[in-house]
């Protein structure tokens, strides 16, 4: 009797802890959403009047800048304009608004109707227990709107939005296999007693078929499936490395397959990966996902740990469970190929996936699986070459620059923040970075400084770089303890290659010396396993 009572008390304590953890997560999420809103509003504020006038007249065409921007920059611009539209619309609002929309005294007569910027809503996709999905047009561009049904899914929607703006959108800048989150808005709906505010999530529209549909209709060969899976591993590795991201709901309905005609490149570990496939997978629906923006803080689901879904990163979960889902709906050929892929995990039983994950399977990172595939399947439609890019988004236009281009002020320049720290601010690397971002280096202003100025900047960089050369010659036993410093040196290597300053002798000598060092060789071999240990903490 006492044992049963003790067990019941323990269960209640566990429930209470999960409830408290969920509340803490929501408070943290709301704070981060408010931070994002403040940042967006500060960028938009100078252009509010122009935004209202252009929308009222039907003159705001996002296509105006579409050809001048990368796809990722264009999506970022859309998200800022979307927030601006919410601010100037009385019948809707957003979560954690920074101001009461816009100052009503200033714009008393100038609020716009929502149907001026969000139109043609229609039901879209398959029926879902979680809620309804709609397709609509935001200023002429297709978007997806998700409306949750119950309180649990309302919590999921907030987490989906948080993961989107704080994690996924940043990953989308580096890798096209994530769907961009544009915004969240409240829509007032009448009920029997009172009007209720529903929270709707708005995301990028991905044009393609679900992986489930393609597998069921036998539209993929095993090689094409393998190319798709390898791309998903690349995306998951980028997500885990940057934000300890775990999708936790990566079934075949949550992967959209997009036909592509052009190659694209991603950057993982020490590789530039040139992808040359017919199909690109895009992962959607991040309400169940876990992510970590700050050390020792992880946001995720607290209520379904019995199903193997945790509020923190479980490195091997997504690839393994994804393959199980695919095997269930595949034809004989692909099913046989998936069984062969399972050899990566060794001789294990795949029936009870939760217990299997708790063993060796859950400890395997996407990068380790990807390297296994590279060795085992030479027919993979990817080229792996030495890495030359630190981060794609480094050279993208800022939202402020894009807003200035859109609203009447094309000459505004935006100062960029430091790449690493203040030690680089006065050097040639930082100068090149700022020139490239502001498109100054390629025109008539190329020789804007004197030779003595260039020499002074290069000298400043060399003093900073010399610290890392001395680090190279340290004892081998210290390398694992100084992995953060080593990662900084590797990032500098990729940055200098990205800025194409190899032709400058001082930088070329540093690059050659660093790449030839035993320490860099050690990094390439050991970093994946160090990452695995850190992700399992």
Curated annotation (Swiss-Prot):
Binding-site list for ATP: 125-133, 146
EC number assigned by the record: 2.7.-.-
Single Gene Ontology BP annotation: intracellular signal transduction
SUPFAM superfamilies in the cross-refs: Protein kinase-like (PK-like)
Keyword Amino-acid biosynthesis: no
Residues in coiled coil: 1-74
Enzyme class: transferase
Annotated InterPro entries: Kinase-like_dom_sf, Prot_kinase_dom
Catalytic site positions: 249
GO terms for MF: ATP binding; histone H3T3 kinase activity
Keywords: ATP-binding, Coiled coil, Kinase, Nucleotide-binding, Transferase
Entry annotated with the keyword Nucleotide-binding: yes
Location of the Protein kinase domain: 119-429
PANTHER family according to UniProt: INTERLEUKIN-1 RECEPTOR-ASSOCIATED KINASE, SERINE_THREONINE-PROTEIN KINASE HASPIN
General function of this protein: Probable kinase.
Family: Belongs to the protein kinase superfamily.
Protein name: Probable kinase 439L
Species: Invertebrate iridescent virus 6
Species classification: Viruses, Varidnaviria, Bamfordvirae, Nucleocytoviricota, Megaviricetes
